[in-house]
């Protein structure tokens, strides 16, 4: 393809809307100075589903979860009865998924409780609520923006992403493929539906999952955004802008001003999952369900993180099984890795390219990437929050007099370009299933971009989406074959018989270098489900258990490698599961600590320099503490390390104390800075010393001196290994 045109840059941060649009011969559309807002119809916020930052735990992989909030698929059981059994209370329910959010009592860890419930088979799955994160845009210095090619201007502002060297959107539009009749759900922070480029294509509904409220007027919605801080005072949070940029990528109106979305005749819904504070997967799932139930045909997700969420998996399956296309951003991690939800089966993961059609440096890559689209310095909308009287709300991202447009970078925007193209496809071929939509983009992509000039590569998937080639296919009837479903049942052979292999990692790798890759975990029955995936033969890989949840050493896992075939048109309800039997990896809810009893200094077990203990547990009583003794000399520089949640997984938030023979607290350490507890200390005298290991819940409040002042913390996944070294 022809080389990309050079692009100089300017700073949009200092340009007023008058300056920017006057250069294009357009009148100013920015409203006048702020004034009092119109009466609010925003629903008062009760904060019932807010996440307490003190309850957010970060695992060794960087995953974040809420310690006291449990997400449960009830399998038809009563949420209230289960909450009573756990000593907690029901915060909310999702009837479409048979899911409840339960708050646990003090001292209980949701991960441990969830695994125990799954092991008992009482529920289909139970897991701690995970914390989701917006994919932060990559902001680059924007010094210069010079002359643009004529074919980069579609309304009044330059958009290289849509030109003939990139997506070539005009070729599809000229052929009549504009996304007309298709609705796209934008699950993000709240889109500004008052923006002149978004208002014409807003589908008329906006959703606040925190209050479970649907807004149907522009003023009502922007007042709701205004009220995210608890009061409607004509001020909005300056951090709210991402969803506006995302929505404009897809559906900015072709109205003679500003920019144009890649699907200019599509409509969009906005669901505001990102609001001040942490956002959990529960409200994300609620937003997915709402978007599906409104009739969206495409759902865009420019957010994500690491780890696995069975709730998000179920929510996206809810969409995919209803033939709704799900697009996700690959991520901005600068490296090869799987991210959630980009790793899930059935979704379309989009990578980002720069103006030269090279992979953007920040774009996450791997075999799960499907296609690529522009994502560096793309021209998109920024929020204005225009009241009904023409004034603007204050305090927002776009300053008073600002343009309402910005240059911005990230897979957050290659993703919605991909969503918009999906809308274009479905506007022409509404009967295609999500896999056919994905495959049509892949088959018509420009595979010359990326490291493999002949086709698929991990950096860009099948290559740059090309809407000119796509339009040629849409004119005909030759469509890709339908997707299919696969199911795997994992069992573990134990002395007492076969038990379900819960929390097993199950991966499907398509044959060949360009075979798609999908990853899920098993439920409490040992099933792993794959919905709307490519037909064909896969390499099936299974490993159990997930040590990030249960903790432990790699030799505790068992693995399997085999084959699985997926047939076009097959669905989950009728496909026969493939059985996999392992001989170890069953989750142990009643482990034996080899060092107990060692709950007092008198019962301390010996440890010496250069040694590590076996796997041990803070478990078996509400406030367990473990003592180990060693002999040292005056002047010895010692280091004691607890290898716990950060190092070996599991749930132990470790706390370590060094005591002398009298029991005096010489030093203590909680885990911090991405590592478990560690004490480095110079011994003052010859003698016997003691290391006391417990959890922060038990000992932090008293700095290690009084467990009675702490909280209960009794979990079979409170695992650790203690190491003692003599430093030189």
Curated annotation (Swiss-Prot):
Its EC number is 3.4.21.-. The keyword Cell membrane does not apply. One of its GO terms (cellular component) is extracellular region. Pfam families: Fervidolysin_NPro-like, Ig_DR_A0283-like, Peptidase_S8, PPC. Residues 23-148 form a propeptide. The active site is at residues 188, 242, 412. GO terms for biological process: proteolysis. This is Probable subtilase-type serine protease DR_A0283. It comes from Deinococcus radiodurans (strain ATCC 13939 / DSM 20539 / JCM 16871 / CCUG 27074 / LMG 4051 / NBRC 15346 / NCIMB 9279 / VKM B-1422 / R1).
